[in-house]
Amino acid sequence: MELAEYLNESVVHIFRDATRSSKLNLKELRFLHRAAKIQKEAAQRRLQSDALGTSVPPFLIASIATRCNLHCAGCYARANHTCMDQSFKEEMDAKRWGELFREAYALGVSFILLAGGEPLEREDVLEEAAKTPELIFPVFTNGTLFTPAMLKRFDRHRN
């Protein structure tokens, strides 16, 4: 099995497993069924690119924040000096992140893991992610910055 086919099959398994675990949550099931259709289309775009000699991964990791509110032992971002207590002046703006999200979707990317620093520090980028409902954005967070308003936003924009 070629790498592109293997990765596409992995995406199918993710959706199958998520659907099984969401049987009692109708809102989640609707989201997953819609997303599964979109992911099949993305898989086709990846296979077409692969046939032309360009490999497009189904998953990307986007370090959207340079600041974090914690100092966790073993933090990879602090160890690599990509995370600090305040933002870098060169941090990419939310509009550009939104453009990158749309470009990734057009190529056939299915998931963009939002990491950092602490990604909840960048509500502006989270809003841009919500504007690209065709992609799924797992958020790698320490969870300490969740507010009731933010939880409502995540519920409203399930991607």
Q: Where is each model-derived feature located?
A:
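Conserved alpha-helical substructure of the radical SAM core
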Residues: 3-150
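Glycine-enriched alpha-helix->loop->beta-strand junction motifs that scaffold or abut catalytic
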Residues: 134, 156-159
